[in-house]
Amino acid sequence: MADHLIAHCEIPSTDLERSRDFYHNVLGWEFKAFGNGYLLFNNHKGTMVGLRKVETISKGDSTVFHINIPDIDNILKKAKENGGAVARTKTVIPAMGWYALFNDPDGNTIGLYQKS
């Protein structure tokens, strides 16, 4: 893996099963139990995402990372259908593409990026 790239992101969750199902249904991520209230998605291409069990989450306390995707509108639709909410609709980034933000059922903000 190249230096200075994000290797791992961790998302707090008050309900691991709900979060696992949400991210699977919205983004197709497959999480595996990693022990001690932790689930891990690893595509073996440099991206790992962990779901960490917590009792409470303060709104806005999560790290925002953006995911490259081919169709923002489709992902925002899936997020809403699976208990999430749109935090920012598809927004133009001049000469680059678009971005949007959604909240998962715990209120974590996830960013989306679509190249033009």
Annotate the PLM regions:
Residues M1-R20, T63-F65, K115-S116:
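N-terminal beta-strand motif that seeds the catalytic metal site of vicinal oxygen chelate
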Residues A2, I11, L76-K77, N82-S116:
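Vicinal oxygen chelate
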Residues A7-M48:
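Core segments of cupin and vicinal oxygen chelate
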Residues L16, N42-M48, R52-T63, N68, ...:
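Conserved, structured core segments of small domains
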Residues E30, G50, V86-T89:
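A short linear hydrophobic-aromatic micro-motif
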Residues F34, K53-V54, Q114-S116:
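Acetyl-CoA-dependent GNAT
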Residues G35-Y38, K59-D61, I93-W98:
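Short acidic/glycine-enriched loop/turn segments that link adjacent beta-strands
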Residues D61-G84:
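Mid-chain, well-packed structural core segment of small domains
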